[in-house]
Amino acid sequence: MEQQKKTAGKKAGSWSLLMGAAFLMATSAIGPGFLTQTATFTNTLAASFGFVILISIILDIFAQTNVWRIIAVSGKRGQEIANMVLPGLGYFIAILVVLGGLAFNIGNIGGAGLGLQVLFGITPETGALISAVIAILIFVIKEAGKAMDRFTQIAGFVMIILTVYVAATTAPPVGQAVANTFVPEHISIFAIVTLVGGTVGGYITFAGGHRLLDAGIKGKESIPQVTKSSVVGILITSVMRIALFLAVLGVVSKGLHIDESNPAASVFKLAAGNVGYKIFGLIMWSAAITSVIGAAYTSVSFFKTFSPKIEKNSRGIIIGFIVVSTLAFVTIGQPAKILVLVGSLNGLILPIALGTLLVAAYKKNIVGDYKHPLWLTSTGALVVIVMAVMGIYTLCTQLPQLWS
């Protein structure tokens, strides 16, 4: 009996950690950019955006399942695996991730400030400082990992419930949305790649994988749990994406005009008046603050293994990361050109990192006697090729803007 209780307790604890990793990944993906992109694409593609969401979900699952599985089996972080495949590559990926994480965190902290401005009428800078203090407090707590898991889960549920409520008030044409999801009137490759990059690109896909390692979940025996957790992470993101898509579609189908300078806020205001606008403020703050936490945690996890000192002081470095992003936003705002450059480079992280992990999956010195399924290798390779082509294309089109 005592043994059964212990086993049940262990299973519950393990499931809690797996859900924590899933929510950390999902809420890292659901940031200010996620809200804006979803509203903008729905406004332009209308019901056909359902097809874009469907394809991006499939590609996201292929990418994420590969990454988390190989990290768990090897028991090593992404940068360690990359260095074993090609010495020095891990450092290169780590630099890209940290630059991306820092630049996007300036945007995330700005989004959190904007959310509090909508809710309480304070300036975005004051809102950003308050949000930074809240994010820092999570890492000051002794059980920082558990606090982070719990916070991202609560924020995730709040965002989804509020967005579903607003979607219901707009009475979207669900039948039309379902029909267009499978037989679209318009297809946008750019929208698909943008969504995949925003959901599992950059540091985001490693957020949950590295969290599981920190919690001690690794080895071949953990594969079923890790796979389940990786898919749940994508599904949480997708539920939020679909709810927001339906909310925007409901507004668009009524012929109401969405303000292109702030599409997400405009949708909530048109859907539910001033109450809707306040709901947007809370969703924006939740989306931004969880992305601040996810970006800081994951970026630092990429440098942890390079030195025992970094490993020992990782919480202090995470706090420093949040402080630097906040000071950058408060003093210089969002540096547009830097964001363009880093955003372009960010598109290359997923194909480089995933490609490296797929090579690692066949190296005995990294994964032992583990056999990586062929269907995962081939689908992962497909994502690598698609995202590499689009990543290079984006880089070539965005870089000239820096000098214009």
Curated annotation (Swiss-Prot):
The keyword Hydrolase does not apply. InterPro entries: NRAMP_fam. GO terms for molecular function: cadmium ion transmembrane transporter activity; manganese ion transmembrane transporter activity. Keywords: Cell membrane, Membrane, Transmembrane, Transmembrane helix. Pfam families: Nramp. The chain crosses the membrane at residues 15-35, 43-63, 84-104, 121-141, 154-174, 187-207, 231-251, 279-299, 316-336, 338-358, 373-393. Its main location: membrane. One of its GO terms (biological process) is manganese ion transport. It comes from the Bacteria. It is a multi-pass membrane protein. GO terms for cellular component: plasma membrane. Signal peptide: none annotated. Disulfide bonds: none annotated. It is found in: Cell membrane. Belongs to the NRAMP family. This is Uncharacterized membrane protein YcsG. The gene is ycsG.
